[in-house]
């Protein structure tokens, strides 16, 4: 049995009340000081590396929302950013990254192509879709997201989860990537099969390109009443079940 001892030394904290006019001059210099926290405390923690309590299948994160922009436009920094996320390499005793083993990929609803007409004011909360208005696929889209997927696989992360915040705008009641129906789905009843087929087609495309798609998550936070703050849709349990059956 190997025991490792870790000594934890908390950082020193300081508190200061500042005025709105000056970031360095307190409004009330005579304000009583807080408790004295200048004394560090040394604690001993013992870790038994030979005892297993659980098995973690994956350590992951999501590409919502910044990677779509970073991967496409931040060409001078994107390689370093992806290395910080996906690298498991140790150099000089220090990790080059956090070694993510799973990556969630947003199947956007197409509000990015709508621009201001999408009704989503914050452009960073709009997303691209491979589905075009004539219901064909444009596989050159989602360039930034595909860059992150490619780098993830290159650096050793090859478990991808596809997820959707909203059906494609071509299939929704209001033609938008957000819902005006409260807790009900924004997906028109006649398009359940189309939406399921779209997700399956994207998964098949990625699989053919060598990405391991371990899961498809067809709805995201379905009990929230999404508005125009970002892409999103509510879903009832019956609606989720109907979509899952189409996707199966």
Indicate residue ranges for each PLM-predicted region.
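Bacterial N-terminal signal peptides that target proteins for export
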Residues: 1-7
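N-terminal catalytic cores of secreted or lumenal carbohydrate-active enzymes
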Residues: 42-213, 234-241, 245
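Acidic/polar, low-complexity intrinsically disordered N-terminal segments immediately downstream
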Residues: 23-46
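C-terminal motif of bacterial Sec signal peptides marking the signal peptidase cleavage site
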Residues: 14-17
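Polysaccharide-binding and catalytic clefts of secreted carbohydrate-active enzymes
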Residues: 219-240
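Bacterial signal peptide processing site
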Residues: 19-21
